[in-house]
Structures are given as structure tokens and as C-alpha cells.
Amino acid sequence: MSLPLRNPLDSVSLERALEDLIVRFIINVPPEDLATVERELFHFEEAQWFYTDFVKLTNPHLPNMKFKTFASYVISLCPLVWKWQDVNPEEALQKFSKYKKSIPVRGAAIFNETLNKILLVKGTESDSWSFPRGKISKDEDDVDCCIREVMEEIGFDLTNYVLEDQYIERNIGGKNYKIYLVKGVPQDFAFKPQVRNEIEKIEWRDFWKLSRSIHKSNNKFYLVSSMVKPLSLWVKKQKQIQGEEQLKQYAEEQLKLLLGIGTQEEAADPGRDLLNMLQSSVGQKKPLVFSDDESQASISTSAPTTVPPAPSTANSQSVQPIAAGAYAGYPFPFPQYPIPGMQTINPFQFVQSSHQGVFATHSTFTTSHQYPQAQAPQTQQPVPGAVVYPVQSQLQQAYQPPHTPVVKPSVIEDRAPHSKQLLELLKNPRKPEVEDESTAKTLLKLLKNPTKENRTSANTVPSSKGAVSGPSGGRSISGQSIDTANLPSGMASSMGAKSTAIPLYSPRSSLSEMTLPDEPLGGYEEFESSSEEEQGEELAYMNLQEPTSSVMESNAKVENNTLDNISHVDTSGNLSTRSLQSEKTEKSKPTAKPKIKLLKRGETLTPLTPSISSQTATSESSAAGPTVPSEKDVSSRIQNSQGNELLDVLKSKAQPEPSVASTSPAKELLNTLNKPQGSVYQNLLFGANHRKSDDESSPRHSPVSQQARTHEFLNLLKRPQAKAENEELQSVLLTPPANSGMVQNSSTLPNIPYGNLHQDQAAALLFPQQPPQFQQPYAATNTNSKELLAILRKPASNQQKQLHEQTPANPVDQPTTLASEQQNLVKQQISNPSQSLQQGTPLQQPQPQHTQSPSNLHVTGNTAAAQELLGMLRKSRVVP
């Protein structure tokens, strides 16, 4: 048993205690620490702190000594430690005190979370309150010194609170003070000093009360009084920033609530919800059904069985796995299980090698399917290449899984591709599908590259205005022999229908692409020859057409100019079958003698006898072509030449052509007459060549629909009309046409031969927005309409029904037809206007005033159309 050790300083004297401190802190220090008086005195200070902190507490009988007294006792006790004999210790202590005041001090002004309280400390040897602070050490950073001093004095770590740019710096008495501003320190923290005999008290003080009473107290708040103003400004600024942040956060929250953003219901992605619904519905799909005749033979899941495991992993990997997408969403093509007389088959053996990460086991695949016994007739065969294993009944209980919902392995594998496809469908709008792209490409290839046989056959079939024009200048699709056997079935059947027109190309194509000047144009020549003879002087002015109104007015001034010895060349940009012929084509082919007679002023055209038919002109013009048309072509050309032109004029260019089976001919004529005339070009006195915009805006028609339109007009002349329809037709003819409201600029009007036109018609062309000053009375219209109604009520004669059968074999030797006489009547109207309007040229007439109402703009055109219609009906009803 040993005696307890006692503290050696318990009963020592002051001299023994000071000797111990001299040995500890002064004599054994490095020589460089004793190089100057200040450094040596720092070691004296450390010894004094040890005496106060430890020795004095161990031996309370020892006296309390401050630094000056302690330094005087040490120097007097051991004079060798004081190397500077010429330096008075008292003077050295004063110098050391000044040096200590020059050492920078780093501290922190600590505020709570609400910035209304500040933390202050009180020293043991001082009666004033100040910030926790301390002197900076050698080569120490300011922030590190602040953190260290605060940790020593109050025991709180400011590493996560202090900011380098938030501080207040002052120089007081030659000493630099840098106090960092810290906020957000918890007020309930238990502060405790880490050093001895240095900090006596630590308290939270109300900052606003302190700022108001700090100047009244006498030195109770050291260093705080000199920094209270900047501290107040910083606190106000921080509160303002904090208030703005709170206001912004509050406003953002309120705005989100109003807009419904940020709520839990809207946080979920609707697309993801939809995908989850689809995946859950696919995952919980009904059990697979195996049947030979699609009968609903359900698979029982009450007593699930297991499939025998594969023998080894290497053996299962040797089998080539089947693609998981091959059976996605479809029943597996496996027979009913088990099959009598056959070995056990593992239908899902391919899943083990390719999808081992999906299922729990690697050596076996379990399923909850209970395959029914083989009661239905067996129709399906086992999957070729499947591995056959013997039945191992002893392993069923070991691998029997719990009851789980039926899930197909292929469905689990295919969820990701289906989700990606659904996302692509949701992101990308669906593009319109082209149903029969091959048909359009085939037609475009036929139109762009016509064969020589098609080009040759185009000359043998006469062309009409309603036919669909091909890619070449004057050829028509009616003349091309399209092999429907090479086309798709839907295309071949649609081309065979009589009431369906197939637009083979866009009418907006350029004229340069549509013109082939070196091709023979037999059908076009036949049509042009008949048109030149029938229409007379109007065709001679087609070479002068210009798209501007100034040229149109100049043509009106030079109405007496003659164009003798000039053949007809259509140079307009119209895409119709009459205007696709180029000037080069007209010059290259041998031209026959022009059958045009230009009438001078006052001269009239001698009418031909009714016995002369228009077949002579048609056959003569067709004789110049490479082939002579057959008798059937001539007869069809006689019927199509006038009837088709009349139907084209009567029908509105803005409305699509109705089907023959849907509307009767009488109803079609009534609907046409009921429509307001949109422009003056619908007048019958102006031929189809003058209406430049008709063919550009209206779709082209096939030869099948053209023949149907010809038969429509023949049936109209043959069949008697109903009483209601005749009355409606009479009301239409007696009523003046209403203004269509369409204002047509003069710059878009084509050039019209004003010298040989009616005066009111020329005035209407020059001023399309104003009515003519001289209105034609409605008496002629009423009389003509009554006569038209009387003709329509009469039943068609037998000779009229047999008109197309009386065509002679040789059309060259026959006189002109009734169509020529009808055109002569039109020419007489052009050359010899009525006496009520024969008062001068259009230039001599006073121009219509702009203040007049345009309600009677097309009265003259309607009267002329009715007169020409009556003339055609009279001649067609006359028995030869």
C-alpha cells in the first residue's frame, strides 16, 4: 500500500513557485524567442497565466499578482534572464504594453435568428461588456483567428456562420479591430468558455435597448459603443432583405396556389400516369386462351403447376433465344398441356437464357397457369427446336410458387418499347397517311414520260375543251392509251367509271413544262379549225391579249384595225386545251388556208343554208393531221363540239362538276341559270378562248366525264321537262340577274376585240364595276324565255333522236352542220347589234357614272345568252 501522491505546489513558498515557472517558460525557450525584449516578455506573460490558472488554485495562500508585479519578482529573483542591463524593467514593461496594443484583434458580433439580440461577454479582470475577441497570432488568417477566439471564449463554432465580407473594422487607440457580423446563431445554445480565468459572464442583450442606452452608461460596453451605428444599419438591411425574401417566397407560394402549380395533384406527370395505367392493365391481363376455333376455353389458375427446370445453365444457353417482341400481346403458339402420348414440353425455356434478371430463379421458370387436360381436338404443333425434358413430379412441391396474378414474361419485356412508342406518339403529331402513293407516282410517270404509241394515238382521237390535258402542249389524256392492267386495282376501276373525273396533274403547273412544240397535234388542230370557222373574227384578237388594262384600252381605240393574213396563234398563259399550243408549233407544222373572214364595219356574214353541216370544216381540218378520224369519232365530235361548249359556259367554274346520276339535266340547267354571273366572261358572246381564268381555276375533266356531259345536254333536248321546272326556268329568265358582289379589277381583264362587240358589252368590260347607261329592256328576254319554254315542253321528235345516226360516211363532202348556223347567228348579233343600242362605238358613248348602282351589270349578257340558247334550241328541234 503506497501513499497517495500529493501536489508538489500545495505547500511551497512563492520563491519555489517562481523558480518552477522560470524553468518551465523562460530559460528553456529557443534562443530566437529571447532576441528581443518583447518576445521575452511574452514568455513572462505565459508564466503569469500559468501561475494564475494552476498554482494559485493549488495553493490559495499565494498572493494574486498582475503582470507588472509578476515580471518584477521574476527579474529580481533571476537577474540572468534579463540580458539587457541598460534597459530598465519598468521602461521595458511600458514598451511591451504599447506593443500589445498594436496587435490586431479579431472578434465577432453574434446575433440571434430574429436579429433583435446580440451576444456579449465580460472579462474576469474588467468590468465592461464587449464582443468575444482576441489577438491574432503569427501568420494566422483573420477568419481563422475569429473562429478560434470565439471558440475559446464562448465555446461556439462559427465556421458555418461567418462570412468574410460581412465585418466592421475600426482603429481605436492605434489598435485595429475587425469584428465579423454573424446572424442566425441559436439563442438556446449553452455557451461555455474554453479558457480559464478570462471570461466571467456570457449574456444575450437586447440590441435595440442597448443601442438607445449605450451612451448613458460609463464604459460598461467596451468597443460596442463605437460600432453601434454600423451594427444598426446592418441589422436593418438584413431585416429588409429577409423581409423581401419572405415576401417573394410568400408571393410565389400564393401564385402557385392560384395557378395550381406545385400542388400534389399536379406534381405527377399525366403522361407517366397514362403509361402506368397502360402497363398495369397489360400486366393484369386475363389468362391466355388456347383454342383451335377461337372458342373461349379459359385456363384455370386454382392449382398452379410448375414447369420442370432446365438441366443446366450451359445447356439452356445453347438454345437460341426467341425475340421477346415476337409474341408481344399475343398468345403463345403452344399446344394444350399435357398432351397424351407426348413428352413434357417447357414452352418458356427461351426465357431462362435471355431474361434471367427479370425472374427470381435462374434454373427454372415458374408460372401460375394450370393447363387443362387434352379434351379439345389437337390442332397446333409443338414449337420446333424446343427442348424436351422428362416429367419430374418430385420437384413440383419444391418449386411450387405462391398464388400470383397471371403475368406473361413477354409482356414484362415489352413494357419499355411500348412506353417509348406511346411517348413518341404523344410528342409527335400524327402525319397524314398517303393511301395510294404508288398510284400517284404511276400516273406522274405516265404523264412525264409518254410513250411514242401514246403520242401517236393522241392524234387519232379528237380533243374537246372538257378533256383532261396531258403534260404536252395540245395533247389530251383522252387520246392516250393508258394500260389499266399495270395500274393498281383502285385506279383501274376509277378510270372506268363514266361519272368520275381523275385530275391527273395540277392545273397550276408552268407552261414551259407543259409544252412540247415538236409533237403533232391532230386533235387540237381539228378543234381549232372548227373553232376558227365557227367563232369568226373573235379568234383573230387572241394574239393581242395582254394582262394590263392599258393595253385593253388601247385595243378599244384601234377597233378598226384589221389583221389579215395572220393565222391564229394562242400565246396566252392559259393552261386550257386551246391555249397550250406554242408559236413554234404553229410555225413548224404545215398550215392550211385560214378559214377566217374578217368583217368590216357594216358588213354582215352571209348565212349558210341549213342543209350544210359543220362536218366539212371539221373533216378538212382533221385531214391535215397525221391520221383520218373514224366515223364514230366524227359523230361524237359533232355532238361534243357545241353541247360541251354550252355546258362549259353555263356551268359555274367555281363549283365542282356534279355526277350524272345525282342531278337531272333540267335541274342542272336551272341551277346554272339561278347562279349570279360572276364575271362578264360567262356571256355566250365571248368564246371559251376569251375566258382566261376559267381553265386556270377550274379542274380539268376526263374524256369519260366529257362524254357524260354531252349526253346530259342531249337528254335535256330530248326529254320533256316537268311543269315545276319550266316555271322555275321561266322565273329565272324573267328575273334580272343579281349582282354577284365580285369586284374584278381592270388589270386582270383580258384583251377583247371591242370593234366587233356589242356596245353594252364593251362598256361592261371597260367598267366592270358600273352598269351600262343604256339598259336593254326585258321584253326580249320575256319573249325569248316563253319561246324557250314552249320548245322545252314539246316532246322530242324521232328525227331528233336519230340525229347522230344520220352522219354520212364521208364527212368531207357534207355541208356545215347546225352548229355552224348557230355560230352564224351569234356573229350576226356581234356585227349587227339591235337598233336600240346602235348609236356609236364604245368610245363615242358617254362613260357610265360611278354613282350608278351595279345591280343591272349583266342584263345584256343574260339576254344574249338566252338568245343564243334559243337559237340553238330552234335549230336542234327543226326536222330536216
UniProtKB/Swiss-Prot annotation:
Motif mapping: Nudix box:
134-155
Q: Which GO terms describe its molecular function?
A: 5'-(N(7)-methylguanosine 5'-triphospho)-[mRNA] hydrolase activity; chromatin binding; manganese ion binding; mRNA binding
Give the cofactors, semicolon-separated.
Mn(2+)
Q: Name one GO cellular component term.
A: cytoplasm
The record, for InterPro entries, names: DCP2_BoxA, DCP2_BoxA_sf, Dcp2_NUDIX, NUDIX_hydrolase-like_dom_sf, NUDIX_hydrolase_CS, NUDIX_hydrolase_dom
Task: Describe the location of the Nudix hydrolase domain by residue ranges.
Answer: 101-227
Major location (coarse)? cytoplasm
> Which sites bind Mn(2+)?
149, 153
Task: List where Low complexity composition bias occurs.
Answer: 611-624, 833-855
A Pfam cross-reference name: DCP2
EC class name: hydrolase
Q: Which SMART domains match?
A: DCP2
Its GO biological process terms? deadenylation-dependent decapping of nuclear-transcribed mRNA; deadenylation-independent decapping of nuclear-transcribed mRNA; mRNA processing; nuclear-transcribed mRNA catabolic process, nonsense-mediated decay; positive regulation of transcription initiation by RNA polymerase II; stress granule assembly
Q: Where in the cell is it found?
A: Cytoplasm, P-body
Output compositional bias ranges, type Polar residues.
475-485, 548-580, 737-750
Basic residues bias locations: 590-599
Q: Where does the record place the region Disordered?
A: 293-317, 446-485, 548-638, 736-755, 824-862
- Which of UniProt's keywords are assigned here? Cytoplasm, Hydrolase, Manganese, Metal-binding, mRNA processing, Nonsense-mediated mRNA decay, RNA-binding
Q: Which family does it belong to?
A: Belongs to the Nudix hydrolase family. DCP2 subfamily.
**Function of the molecule:** Catalytic component of the decapping complex necessary for the degradation of mRNAs, both in normal mRNA turnover and in nonsense-mediated mRNA decay. Removes the 7-methyl guanine cap structure from mRNA molecules, yielding a 5'-phosphorylated mRNA fragment and 7m-GDP. Decapping is the major pathway of mRNA degradation in yeast. It occurs through deadenylation, decapping and subsequent 5' to 3' exonucleolytic decay of the transcript body.
Q: Describe the protein's quaternary organization and the partners it interacts with.
A: Component of the decapping complex.
Q: What is this protein called?
A: mRNA-decapping enzyme subunit 2
| Species whose genome carries this gene | Eremothecium gossypii (strain ATCC 10895 / CBS 109.51 / FGSC 9923 / NRRL Y-1056)
